[in-house]
């Protein structure tokens, strides 16, 4: 495994399943397992598969200036979002050059969560907040699992009432297996999401 400074809660489980863990965004991440890669691909495309995407960075952006600053830091009008709605956006630097992509989740009237990749989105959000009424919290205790594939919603429907009614690019707070979770329908790999 590469030298990672972030640890997935599932790292031991990934190793037990045969992954060597590769660095992604500073976190040891399972890209492959010891089984047949074609079988793993086929399972996700025809049934369902669970992927640990905890390497994505999660940033909570909260305060009276959060909305206007996100409008400035991203390419989307986040004022159109209401709690429970999310949007895919690009992040640009002061010169208008692409620095990261993200999904912005509105979690409350003045509260957002920005989930971004390996670019410099976090730094952009921190710079935008300086001297403004907004708190910025990088959350490395929040882990992402991506359940994808045509049978994904069938599995969740057994455990989360009303999940079939969740619109695309919306999210909800609920419980799954007795634990508090946020479930979002934000996948974009070709099926329901």
What do these predicted ranges mean?
Residues 1-92, 97:
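Acidic, proline/glycine-enriched N-terminal capping motif
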């Amino acid at each position: 495994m590469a030298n990672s400074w972030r640890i997935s809660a599932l790292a031991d489980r990934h190793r037990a399943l045969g992954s060597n863990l590769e660095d992604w965004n500073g976190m040891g991440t399972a890209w492959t397992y010891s089984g047949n890669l074609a079988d793993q691909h086929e399972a996700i495309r025809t049934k369902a598969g669970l992927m640990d995407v905890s390497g994505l960075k999660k940033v909570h952006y909260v305060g009276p200036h959060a909305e206007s600053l996100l409008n400035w830091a991203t390419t989307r009008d986040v004022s159109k979002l209401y709690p429970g709605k999310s949007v895919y956006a690009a992040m640009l630097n002061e010169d208008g050059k692409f620095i990261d992509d993200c999904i912005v989740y509105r979690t409350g009237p003045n509260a957002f969560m920005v989930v971004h990749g390996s670019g410099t989105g976090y730094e952009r959000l921190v710079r935008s907040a300086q001297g403004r009424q907004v708190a910025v919290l990088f959350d490395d205790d929040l882990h992402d699992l991506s359940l994808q594939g045509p049978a994904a919603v069938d599995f969740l429907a057994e455990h989360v009432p009303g999940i079939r009614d969740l619109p695309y690019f919306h999210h909800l707070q609920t419980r799954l297996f007795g634990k508090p979770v946020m479930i979002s329908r934000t996948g974009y790999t070709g099926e329901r999401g």
